[in-house]
């Protein structure tokens, strides 16, 4: 499912994926990607909604609002694979989705809600006999995989849309193999014949 794939391949937040529109799909220097410019958030019905004044917001449906990102860092360009790019456009053309229409909606044509995605995500996990984890863990996976690939910190924060590497590191979980590989690169082999001789001398002196 493309909605799930975007969580892993692009590290996009839930609201950013729900709000994705064709006009956000761009090619820069021949690189396909997503220019993240908006998100969907729950702020309540129009008569009850309390929205920060610095956010541009448009009511979509029920308690759902289309807003600008909460931080400058969240407004970012995230490269995606050619395969994902082509499949997104295939969906757009097949369903006749306009430039400012939502790429993902529920069966009634309304914006996707987290509860709807959570239901389908859990259903997919069960079908694949996988343990229950939240879809938000996909962002942790993206942060961890970019760290494993030794991507520079500034690039990782740019992709994740974080304001600092501290937050990105909070999402990062190093696996044992990558830690071992990094340690092997940093620390040379310290074992040689001299080490054995020195140990014997120290023992005799004592």
Where does each model-flagged region fall?
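Short, charged phosphate-coordinating catalytic segments
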Residues: 7-50, 154-155
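C-terminal secondary-structure termini that scaffold catalytic or DNA-interacting sites
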Residues: 40-75, 82-84, 107-108, 166-169, ...
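Structural detector for helix-capping/boundary residues
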Residues: 20-23, 141, 174
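Generic structural detector for well-ordered beta-strands
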Residues: 35, 77-79
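Basic, Lys/Arg- and aromatic-enriched nucleic-acid-binding interface segment
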Residues: 1-14, 18-20, 28-31, 65, ...
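Short, basic (Lys/Arg/His-rich) helix/loop patches that form interaction surfaces
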Residues: 1, 10, 78, 90-111, ...
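Extended hydrophobic-aromatic, low-complexity segments
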Residues: 3, 36, 44-47, 88-89, ...
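Short functional hotspots where side chains directly engage DNA or cofactors
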Residues: 31-39, 134, 145, 154-175, ...
């Amino acid at each position: 499912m493309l909605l799930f794939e975007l969580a892993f391949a692009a590290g996009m937040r839930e609201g950013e994926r729900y709000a994705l529109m064709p006009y956000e799909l761009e090619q820069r220097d021949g690189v396909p990607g997503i220019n993240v410019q908006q998100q969907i958030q729950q702020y309540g019905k129009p008569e009850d909604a309390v929205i920060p004044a610095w956010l541009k917001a448009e009511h979509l449906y029920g308690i759902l609002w289309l807003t600008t990102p909460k931080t400058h860092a969240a407004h970012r360009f995230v490269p995606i694979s050619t395969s994902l790019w082509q499949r997104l456009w295939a969906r757009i053309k097949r369903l006749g989705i306009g430039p400012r229409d939502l790429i993902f909606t529920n069966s009634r044509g309304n914006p996707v809600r987290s509860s709807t995605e959570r239901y389908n995500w859990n259903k997919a996990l069960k079908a694949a006999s996988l343990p229950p984890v939240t879809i938000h863990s996909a962002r942790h996976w993206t942060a961890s995989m970019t760290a494993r690939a030794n991507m520079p910190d500034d690039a990782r924060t740019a992709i994740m849309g974080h304001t600092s590497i501290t937050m990105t590191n909070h999402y990062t979980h190093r696996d044992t193999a990558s830690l071992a590989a990094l340690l092997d690169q940093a620390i040379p082999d310290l074992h040689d014949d001299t080490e054995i001789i020195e140990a014997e001398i120290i023992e005799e002196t004592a």
